Amino acid sequence: MKLLYPTSLKLDPKLLEGFGASLQSYNVKEKIPEEHTDAEVLIAWCNSPNNLKDAASRLKNLKWIQSLAAGPNDVLNAGFDPKTIAITTGSGLHDQTVAEHTLGLLLVSARKFHLMRDSQMQGKWPGSLGGPQPDKEPGTFNTLSEARITVWGFGNIAKQLTPWLRALGADVKGIARSAGVRDGVQVYSEDNLSEILKETDALVMILPGSDSTKNALNAERLKLLPKHAWVVNVGRGTCIDEDALNSALDNGEIGGAALDVFATEPLPESSPLYKQKNVVLSPHAAGGRPRGAEGLIAENLRRFLAKQELKNAL
């Protein structure tokens, strides 16, 4: 059995020895070499769309794809058929890093670090941001203490993030497809979204990309947020109507936005988001380092050889 692993991941092949597999590295930006098209297992991480499409058409013996991304979109969009090929994701590998980045974006937004940096680059002292400041003033978002944080898309990343937010005094609510209490957090169904948005200081979006979530945050829902509220998106860029977001920012309908993902990446230079004063942009940097990848690959390889159910299978 041949297993292809990507050069985009710093992986010690010795960790996968002992399974009786032939381990071969491959370049995720180039076509799979002809001598490796007989592979039965493909590990995917940061593959180019052309690489995956090529693999989908030429790897006729493929039986299992282990993607290290949190979701399967890239693999499915390339044309791999989940009915004939086992597809597993890297769900859980990015929880801590994305949660950490999200916390950072929230702190930057609340404490106005972005404005301080802007002044620094202009050689100016941002005096209005220092000295005596009102604390927890109604109609503002300047601290996480007692801030009303709504997490839309309450999965594993949210469960990692919530204890950190609560440690800083935030009041956390969740929005998901089904209501309930998860890890001590009250999670509401999307039927309650309108009411929850009206009482939100910062909306954290961790939604997956799909037809059902496209432009989930649209003009109508943006108008429900308080004028001081910030939007933080670390899920998928397609979940926000960027034209509506820009309009809301221009008209002062929301306080600002901290975005790590975008409908088109890289974000085009023509995007007005670059010039918005109260916008913080990061280049899809929240994840990018799948922690525990070797362990997941080894465990699923063991299960695959034993014909057991794979972890994170579609």
List the model feature ranges, each with a label.
Residues 85, 90-148:
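Phosphate-binding beta-alpha-beta segment of Rossmann-like dinucleotide-binding domains, i.e.
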Residues 5, 149-151:
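Hydrophobic Val/Ile/Leu positions in short beta-strands of Rossmann-like dinucleotide-binding domains
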Residues 268, 276-295, 299-304:
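Adenosine-phosphate binding glycine-rich loop
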Residues 1-88:
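An N-terminal-biased, well-structured beta-alpha scaffold segment characteristic
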Residues 173, 178-272:
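Rossmann-like adenosine-cofactor binding region
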